C-alpha cells in the first residue's frame, strides 16, 4: 500500500463541516453529518466521501490502508488556532498567586508573567526548546490536533524571537502536525526597555519585523493590545508595518479591559482577534461586519477566573467564532481539547455543532487555511479524527475525557489509542 492512502470505512457518522471559508452566524450550526459513510484519502488528499459500495467500485483496496470505523464518528482534524507552545521554564508558582487573589497584571507588574517566561526562553538553547516543544506537539496530536498555530513572544529580543521561530521551522519539517507561525515580538515590553515603549516598538518595526518578513519566518504578526502593554495606537503602528511587509495580522484584544482591540481588528482587516473577554458590543459587531474571526480561549478565562467571552452574542450578531487552547506556561498551561470543548458548550452557550465548527473550519479560517484544511471536502488535506463513540455528541457528554481513538494526518495514521 502507498503512503498517504487510506480508506476509512463504515463510519456511523462522517461530520464534514463542509466549506472552504469560515462559517459565520447561524451557519456555524451546519456541520453536515453523513450517516454510515466512508472516506477515501489518496496521496494525502481527500478524494471521496460516500458509501463503501460506491467507493470500492472506483478504488482498489489493495492500494490503501483500511481503517474500520464501525460504530465510530469521523471528524476533520482539529485546528488549535492560538498557542504559545515554544518556551523555556515554567510558572507554577504564579498559579498559586492567582489562587490567592493576585490578578494577571499584578503578577506581570512584579516581574512574573510573560517576562518570567522570557528569562527562561532566553536561557534555553535552540535544541532544548526544540525537544520540549516536540513533546508538547506529541501530546496535542493525541487530542486530535492536526494543525497548530504557534507564536514567538517569549524572546522580546532579536536573537530569541528568531530562535523561537526557527524551532517551529525545524518542527514543521520533523513533526506530523502542521504549524502556522506567528511573530509576536509585541507580547510585552522587556525589562531592558522598561519605560521606553516607543524605543522598543521602533526596534520591532525597524530591526525585527523586516528580518522575519524577509526570511518568511512567520505568516502572521500578533500584538498584545492591552492596557499597560501596547495601546491601540501602538498596536496599529506595529500591525500596519507588518501589513506593509506582506504579513497577515491578528491581535490579542480586550482580554483584561475593554480597550478597543476588537474595533482595531475590524479597522485593519485582521484575520482574527483573540481572547475578547471584555470586547464591546460595537467591537463585536464591527468584527462580524468585517469578517474578522473571533478566536476564543475558554481555558484561559477559566484559569484566570475571568468571565468567559460572549460567544453567543458574537454568533447571534453574525460573527464567526474559532476556539483555541492558548496553551502557554502561565495563564493557561493546558492543551486539553476536551476541557476547551466542555467549557465552550457548558459556560459559553455554544451548541455542540457550533463548537465543532469552531475547532475545525473556523480554526482553519483563523489562520488563513480554510481552503486546504478544517473540513472533510474533496481536494483538502487528509486530516481526520476518529472518535471511540458513534456520535459527535459524545464530545461534551464524556466531559473532559479524550475520546479520540485514531488520528490521520495527510492520509497516514499518526496516532492510535492503545487500550
Curated annotation (Swiss-Prot):
Organism the protein comes from: Clostridium tetani (strain Massachusetts / E88)
Pfam families (alphabetical): Amidohydro_1
Molecular functions per Gene Ontology: imidazolonepropionase activity; iron ion binding; zinc ion binding
Gene that encodes it: hutI
GO biological process, one term: L-histidine catabolic process to glutamate and formamide
Compartment(s) where it occurs, according to its Swiss-Prot or TrEMBL record: Cytoplasm
Protein name listed in UniProt: Imidazolonepropionase
EC number(s) from the headed UniProt entry: 3.5.2.7
Family: Belongs to the metallo-dependent hydrolases superfamily. HutI family.
Stated role: Catalyzes the hydrolytic cleavage of the carbon-nitrogen bond in imidazolone-5-propanoate to yield N-formimidoyl-L-glutamate. It is the third step in the universal histidine degradation pathway.
Keywords: Cytoplasm, Histidine metabolism, Hydrolase, Iron, Metal-binding, Zinc
Record's keyword annotation contains Cytoplasm: yes
Reaction catalysed by this enzyme: 4-imidazolone-5-propanoate + H2O = N-formimidoyl-L-glutamate
Pathway involvement of the protein, from the record: Amino-acid degradation; L-histidine degradation into L-glutamate; N-formimidoyl-L-glutamate from L-histidine: step 3/3
Amino acid at each position: 500500500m502507498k503512503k498517504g492512502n487510506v480508506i476509512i470505512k463504515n463510519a456511523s457518522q462522517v461530520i464534514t463541516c463542509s466549506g472552504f471559508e469560515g462559517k459565520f452566524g447561524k451557519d456555524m450550526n451546519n456541520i453536515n453529518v453523513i450517516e454510515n459513510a466512508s472516506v477515501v484519502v489518496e496521496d494525502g488528499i481527500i478524494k471521496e466521501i460516500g458509501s463503501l459500495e460506491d467507493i470500492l467500485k472506483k478504488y482498489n483496496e489493495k492500494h490503501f490502508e483500511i481503517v474500520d470505523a464501525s460504530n465510530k464518528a469521523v471528524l476533520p482534524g482539529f485546528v488549535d488556532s492560538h498557542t504559545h507552545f515554544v518556551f523555556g521554564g515554567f510558572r507554577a508558582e504564579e498559579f498559586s498567586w492567582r489562587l490567592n487573589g493576585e490578578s494577571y497584571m499584578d503578577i506581570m507588574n512584579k516581574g512574573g508573567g510573560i517576562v518570567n517566561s522570557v528569562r527562561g526562553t532566553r536561557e534555553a538553547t535552540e535544541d532544548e526548546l526544540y525537544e520540549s516543544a516536540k513533546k508538547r506537539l506529541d501530546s496535542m496530536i493525541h487530542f486530535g490536533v492536526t494543525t497548530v498555530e504557534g507564536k514567538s513572544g517569549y524572546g522580546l529580543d532579536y536573537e530569541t524571537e528568531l530562535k523561537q521561530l526557527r524551532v517551529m521551522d525545524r518542527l514543521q519539517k520533523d513533526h506530523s502536525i502542521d504549524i502556522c507561525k506567528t511573530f509576536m515580538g509585541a507580547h510585552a515590553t522587556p525589562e531592558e526597555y522598561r519605560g521606553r515603549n516607543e524605543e522598543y516598538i521602533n526596534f520591532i518595526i525597524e530591526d525585527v519585523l523586516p528580518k522575519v518578513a524577509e526570511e518568511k519566518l512567520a505568516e502572521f504578526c500578533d500584538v498584545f493590545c492591552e492596557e499597560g502593554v501596547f495601546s491601540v495606537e501602538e498596536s496599529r503602528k506595529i500591525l500596519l508595518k507588518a501589513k506593509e511587509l506582506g504579513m497577515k495580522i491578528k491581535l490579542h484584544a480586550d482580554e483584561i479591559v475593554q480597550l478597543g482591540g476588537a474595533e482595531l481588528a475590524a479597522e485593519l482587516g485582521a484575520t482574527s482577534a483573540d481572547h475578547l473577554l471584555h470586547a464591546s458590543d460595537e467591537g463585536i459587531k464591527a468584527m462580524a461586519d468585517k469578517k474578522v474571526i473571533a478566536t476564543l480561549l475558554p481555558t484561559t478565562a477559566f484559569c484566570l477566573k475571568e468571565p468567559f467571552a460572549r460567544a453567543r452574542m458574537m454568533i447571534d450578531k453574525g460573527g464567526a467564532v474559532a476556539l483555541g487552547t492558548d496553551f502557554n506556561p502561565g495563564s493557561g498551561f493546558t492543551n486539553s481539547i476536551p476541557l476547551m470543548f466542555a467549557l465552550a458548550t457548558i459556560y459559553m452557550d455554544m451548541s455542540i455543532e457550533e463548537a465543532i465548527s469552531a475547532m475545525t473550519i473556523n480554526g482553519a479560517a483563523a489562520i488563513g487555511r480554510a481552503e486546504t484544511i478544517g473540513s472533510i471536502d474533496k481536494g483538502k488535506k487528509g486530516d481526520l479524527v476518529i472518535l471511540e463513540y458513534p456520535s459527535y455528541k459524545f464530545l461534551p457528554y464524556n466531559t473532559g475525557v479524550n475520546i479520540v481513538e485514531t488520528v490521520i494526518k495527510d492520509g497516514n495514521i499518526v496516532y492510535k489509542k492503545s487500550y
